[in-house]
Amino acid sequence: MYAVFQSGGKQHRVSEGQTVRLEKLDIATGEAVEFAEVLMIANGEEVKIGVPFVDGGVIKAEVVAHGRGEKVKIVKFRRRKHYRKQQGHRQWFTDVKITGISA
């Protein structure tokens, strides 16, 4: 059984027991979270597709950790003008473990 849901403007395909990295959620580590924006649920040959969401579809998960991703460097450079500018960015994320999928 697997499902597709959206969180943080992105869509994720998950199954029970899987750990997924999402955009930062303001929920403490160890707490439970539910996602109601379920786009699709598949159980073997039975597939439910939402318009836009599956009625009664809920994905239950537990927050495992928070952190920051790898640094991305942004560089502005003008040749022959002695102009160079560097900046870095690290995006916050939340790791969640999927504990249940229900339709």
Swiss-Prot record:
One of its GO terms (biological process) is translation. The keyword Manganese does not apply. GO terms for cellular component: cytoplasm; ribonucleoprotein complex; ribosome. GO terms for molecular function: rRNA binding; structural constituent of ribosome. It comes from the Bacteria. PROSITE patterns: RIBOSOMAL_L21 (PS01169). InterPro entries: bL21-like (IPR028909), bL21-like_sf (IPR036164), Ribosomal_bL21 (IPR001787), Ribosomal_bL21_CS (IPR018258). Keywords: Ribonucleoprotein, Ribosomal protein, RNA-binding, rRNA-binding. The keyword Ribonucleoprotein applies. Belongs to the bacterial ribosomal protein bL21 family. HAMAP family: Ribosomal_bL21. Part of the 50S ribosomal subunit. Contacts protein L20. This protein binds to 23S rRNA in the presence of protein L20. This is Large ribosomal subunit protein bL21. The gene is rplU.
